[in-house]
UniProtKB/Swiss-Prot annotation:
TM region positions: none
Protein name as it appears in the record: UPF0306 protein YPK_3704
Record-stated family: Belongs to the UPF0306 family.
Gene3D superfamilies: Electron Transport, Fmn-binding Protein, Chain A
Organism: Yersinia pseudotuberculosis serotype O:3 (strain YPIII)
């Protein structure tokens, strides 16, 4: 079962940040990218904008299973915070795409001039390191509870 205190801290962290590292792969081909994101805590999802012709997008269209990180850039080890995640990503269309685009453009107004597609990354698993709570402190969240 997910610890409610962990979930609150993870959600707060994801709301405060705005850049993720996204890693996609298919077979022996792998690629990473940095993307701006908007967090939807009700769906435990991240919305991001990236063109379909990029290497990472082409891989995501073949294999929607992705992993990545969201991290602060702290110079002090005692303040390091960051998330490792695993999820499934899909290209949005229709009403879902319009709603996500509206949220994304509110957060990043410069995106209003872009026609790049929006993607929804449904988080499946999160491990957060939060040294502010004690060196090496780990918080966990999982969409699917273990059997």
């Amino acid at each position: 079962m997910n610890n409610p205190d962990d979930v609150l801290l993870i959600n707060r962290f994801l709301r405060q940040q705005h850049v993720l590292t996204l890693c996609a792969g298919s077979g022996m081909d792998m690629w990473c990218a940095s993307c701006f994101y908007v967090f939807d805590e009700n769906q435990m999802a991240l919305f991001l904008m990236t063109e379909k012709h990029t290497r990472h997008s082409e891989l995501m269209l073949i294999n929607p299973q992705v992993a990545g990180t969201v991290a602060t850039q702290s110079r002090t080890i005692a303040l390091i915070k960051g998330i490792q995640y695993r999820g499934d990503i899909s290209l949005l269309s229709g009403d879902a795409e319009q709603a996500a685009r509206s949220r994304y453009c509110r957060r990043f107004p410069v995106a209003k001039v872009s026609s790049a597609p929006l993607w929804q990354l449904n988080l499946l698993e999160i491990k957060m390191t939060n040294n502010a709570l004690g060196f090496g402190k780990k918080l966990h969240w999982s969409r699917v509870e273990p059997l």
